[in-house]
Curated annotation (Swiss-Prot):
InterPro entries: ConA-like_dom_sf, Sialidase_trypan, TS_C. Belongs to the receptors of complement activation (RCA) family. It comes from the Eukaryota. Interferes with the efficient assembly of the host C3 convertase. Could protect parasites from complement-mediated lysis by sera from a number of different species. Pfam families: TS_C (PF22925). GO terms for molecular function: exo-alpha-sialidase activity. This is Trypomastigote decay-accelerating factor.
């Protein structure tokens, strides 16, 4: 599971309930931790040729911050397997 929290000043990135990093400002250029060009709900209309796409099976949207224990209880036993040839920002999840 992947989560992004923005509190007005800082952006926090979580993977499987563990904080991956945070930043007071969105990094640009070589400073980027994650390169997410767009994130939207709905179908892919095919306009973005040549880009990698990730399908998200389940999306949960909250209007509050979840505690670490709430995030941990959402995780199935065997959650993430990293493909050997994948870049660090792409994870293969079993949901």
């Amino acid at each position: 599971e992947f989560g992004i929290l923005e509190d007005g000043e800082t952006i926090f990135v979580y993977v499987n309930g563990q904080m991956l990093g945070s930043s007071k400002t969105m990094p640009t250029g070589k400073e980027r931790l994650l390169d997410i060009s767009h994130f939207y709900f709905g179908g892919d209309n095919g306009e973005e040729k040549g880009n990698r796409h990730v399908k998200v099976r389940n999306v949960l949207l909250y209007n509050r911050v979840l505690s670490a224990s709430e995030l941990q209880c959402r995780l199935p036993e065997e959650v993430v397997q990293k493909p050997q040839s994948a870049s660090p920002t792409y994870l293969k999840a079993r949901i």
